[in-house]
Curated annotation (Swiss-Prot):
Compositional bias of kind Basic and acidic residues: 11-20
Gene this chain is encoded by: grpE
InterPro entries tied to this protein: GrpE (IPR000740), GrpE_coiled_coil (IPR013805), GrpE_head (IPR009012)
Keyword Cell membrane appears in the UniProt entry: no
UniProt xrefs under HAMAP family: GrpE
Protein name: Protein GrpE
Organism this protein belongs to: Trichodesmium erythraeum (strain IMS101)
């Protein structure tokens, strides 16, 4: 026991006997250790602050990116709608132009056809009196000898060629006899009271009529049946001389 107390006293004495230089060094070491701890603490705080700033910056950057992406999407959507509208307008214009051109083509074609028909009608109308003369000659002239028969056949051959030419042009002859009178086709130049035909029936063609397609070149001049005069028939039946 006495030995342990002696050892402790010896250590305390050694400590007390340290030189001022040693004490100063130890003090400096302790100060530097304290400074290092404080520096490490500040560094940790700085690192934490930097991490927070980085996270905040990243979050802000993401938000900006999202805003920019949304704006870009909306811009593209607007451009798409505008392009779609312009495309529809162009398609509509194309259809209108196509319809206008088609109408123009049809109108031009119809005008051309009408002009061709008008010229054709005018030319044929000039030939119809010649046809009439040939038909009158055929009806009234009766060849009396071989010479006259040869002449008759010669001009009848010309007449036939003209009729065939008219047929090729689309001209057709009216056959009104026995039909009901139609003012669109016929011209009544004579009327005859008769009980043999219904009233309004064409009983004779006096001048031939012609049609080109659906157009009347010349109305047929006809004689039309009318109802008999019953009073005149009664007088004839009661006349003593009959």
């Amino acid at each position: 026991m006495a030995g342990e107390n002696s050892s402790t006293e010896t250590k305390n004495q050694e400590i007390n006997e340290k030189t001022p230089e040693v004490q100063t060094f130890e003090t400096n070491v302790e100060f530097e250790s304290s400074q290092k701890v404080e520096s490490d603490t500040e560094l940790s705080a700085d690192n934490a602050s930097i991490d927070t700033d980085i996270q905040s910056t990243e979050s802000t950057s993401k938000e900006k990116d999202q805003v920019l992406l949304k704006e870009a999407y909306e811009l593209l959507q607007t451009q798409l709608e505008t392009t779609k509208y312009q495309l529809e307008e162009k398609e509509s214009q194309y259809k209108r132009l196509g319809a206008d051109f088609d109408n123009f083509r049809k109108r031009t074609q119809k005008e051309k056809e009408d002009l061709d028909t008008q010229v054709k009608c005018s030319t044929i109308m000039e030939l119809l009196p010649v046809i009439d003369n040939f038909e009158r000659a055929r009806s009234h002239i009766k060849p009396a000898n071989d010479g006259e028969m040869a002449i008759h056949k010669s001009y009848q051959s010309v007449y036939k060629q003209m009729v065939d030419s008219l047929k090729r042009l689309g001209v057709s002859v009216m056959r009104p006899e026995g039909q009901e009178f139609d003012p669109n086709l016929h011209e009544a130049v004579m009327r005859e009271a008769t009980a043999e035909h219904p009233e309004g029936t064409v009983i004779e063609e006096l001048v031939r009529g012609y049609i080109l397609g659906e157009r009347v070149l010349r109305h047929a001049m006809v004689k039309v049946a009318t109802a008999p005069d019953t009073d005149a028939e009664t007088e004839n039946q009661t006349d003593p001389e009959s």
